[in-house]
């Protein structure tokens, strides 16, 4: 019996390990099982010698965090124990293809770095964002959609990137918020 699964992507330009998805059967959603599973994943990436600088994931934050589902709240606790921080900036989870336009949701990016940080420059944040949106989401759909569908999806990614970019002023330093205190 399968108890769970996870999906990760390695984005080599910025050396990002991006956690796309993690699912665990209901009977295993306990601290005593979920946390060791997550820790094993973290150890796996460490033991493989994969040269990474950033570990990033996203968690939905609908209506200013008023509607965080139980699983997301639990994952947030686990990320706090693993010393992740919340990137305090506008973000959204992109649509899951062209036919699911309503699937994009407000979200937060959660970040763990190889070196301690408490703020990100706008430039670094935008590099990380570009890598996630273009090298991960956009490139995924480039091979999954027809040419015309991909052009539409690509333009959607461009528009959303520009929307987030314009929401951050040039001199902004983006705070990294402790998961525990937020």
Residue spans of the language-model regions?
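Conserved acetyl-CoA-binding loop-helix of GNAT-fold acetyltransferases
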Residues: 24, 29-47
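A conserved beta-strand-loop-helix scaffold within acyl/acetyltransferase catalytic domains
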Residues: 1-26
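Generic marker of residues within folded, mature protein domains
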Residues: 9-12, 47, 100
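Generic "edge-of-domain/loop-turn" microfeature
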Residues: 13-15, 29, 64, 117
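Terminal substrate-recognition subdomain of acyl/acetyltransferases
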Residues: 51-182
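Short, well-structured alpha-helical interface segments that form or flank functional binding sites
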Residues: 14-17, 32-36, 40, 70-77
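Short amphipathic alpha-helical surface micro-motifs
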Residues: 2-3, 37-40, 88-94
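Short N-terminal helix-initiation segments at or just after the protein's N-terminus
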Residues: 1-8, 48-59
